[in-house]
C-alpha cells in the first residue's frame, strides 16, 4: 500500500468537507477525528470552544500524526466557524437529533458541493444557537437504548457518507 507523505497529502485533492467540533472535551476524540479526517482526506477540521488543539500528547496518541496532515483551525466558538463557512458557500449541517432532522440513510450529498458538518460536545451535543445557524440537521438512525454514540465514531460514519 502506497502512503502519501504529509506534503503529498497537503497537495492532494480533498473531499469538499469541513468537520466542525463544537466543544468536544476529550483530546482522544479530537485525535481520532483527525485520524479519520486524514483517512477520508477531508478539507479541514475546525476546533471550536473548549475543543483541544495540537500540539497535545493525547491528541497525537490517537491521531498518529494526522494532526500534521489535516488542515485545522481554532475558533472561540462554533457559531463563528458556521457563519464563516456559510459565507464561503458551504452547506452547514448539524449532526444532531432534532425535530425535522434528515436521516443519514436518506441524505444524498451532491458530489463536489462544499459541505460542513458540526459535531457537538459528548454530553450536551451541538449548542442550540449553532444548530439554529445551520442549514439543516442530519441524524444517524439508532436502535438501542442510549440514542447516542461516541463523537469520533459519529464523525467516521458521517465522513464515510460524504466520500462514498
List the model feature ranges, each with a label:
Residues 1-164:
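Post-transcriptional modification and biogenesis factors for structured RNAs
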Amino acid at each position: 500500500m502506497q502512503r502519501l507523505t504529509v506534503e503529498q497529502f497537503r497537495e492532494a485533492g480533498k473531499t469538499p468537507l469541513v468537520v466542525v467540533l463544537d466543544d468536544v472535551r476529550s483530546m482522544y476524540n479530537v485525535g481520532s477525528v483527525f485520524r479519520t479526517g486524514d483517512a477520508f482526506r477531508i478539507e479541514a477540521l475546525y476546533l471550536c470552544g473548549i475543543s483541544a488543539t495540537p500540539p497535545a500528547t493525547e491528541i497525537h496518541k490517537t491521531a498518529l500524526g494526522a494532526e500534521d496532515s489535516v488542515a485545522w483551525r481554532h475558533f472561540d466558538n462554533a457559531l463563528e466557524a458556521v457563519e464563516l463557512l456559510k459565507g464561503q458557500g458551504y452547506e452547514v449541517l448539524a449532526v444532531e437529533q432534532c425535530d425535522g432532522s434528515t436521516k443519514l440513510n436518506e441524505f444524498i450529498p451532491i458530489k463536489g458541493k462544499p459541505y460542513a458538518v458540526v459535531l457537538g460536545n459528548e454530553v450536551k451535543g451541538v449548542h442550540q444557537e449553532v444548530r439554529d445557524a445551520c442549514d439543516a440537521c442530519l441524524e444517524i438512525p439508532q436502535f438501542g437504548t442510549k440514542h447516542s454514540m461516541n463523537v469520533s465514531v459519529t464523525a467516521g460514519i458521517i465522513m464515510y457518507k460524504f466520500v462514498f
